[in-house]
């Protein structure tokens, strides 16, 4: 077992869960932004060292709720399906994003604990060889 192959999976998982946390935080920061489409993170296994990679997809999901506005001119960027006097709200679901944050933080914590364990195991192996 080489040092690279032992540490590669938890390090890539830390990176992937960090990306997932950033996406959820971005979605929550824009929960009140009209027309915002929440991003989603999917995780893929990497074949060579069985690491993890995060893929971010933005601008997905259902339409947001229609919010009535009065006295504002129609924004040219507003989709044609939105009636006059309304704007499309954000499609971010706060409950879903909070659950995603909990999952990603627990995954991050678990993989962060793997690194000192691998370090200790490799230290034991080195001590046995000496």
Predicted feature residues:
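Amphipathic alpha-helical polymerization modules
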Residues: 1-130
């Amino acid at each position: 077992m080489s040092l690279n192959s032992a540490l590669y999976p938890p390090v890539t998982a830390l990176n992937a869960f960090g990306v997932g946390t950033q996406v959820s935080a971005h979605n929550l920061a824009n929960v009140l932004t009209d027309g915002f489409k929440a991003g989603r993170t999917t995780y893929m296994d990497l074949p060579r060292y069985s690491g993890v990679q995060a893929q971010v997809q933005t601008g997905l999901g259902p339409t947001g709720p229609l919010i009535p506005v009065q006295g504002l001119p129609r924004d040219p960027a507003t989709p044609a399906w939105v009636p006059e006097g309304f704007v499309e709200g954000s499609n971010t679901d706060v409950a879903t994003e909070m659950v995603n944050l909990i999952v990603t933080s627990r995954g991050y914590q678990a993989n962060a604990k793997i690194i000192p364990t691998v370090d200790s195991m490799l230290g034991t192996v080195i001590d046995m060889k000496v």
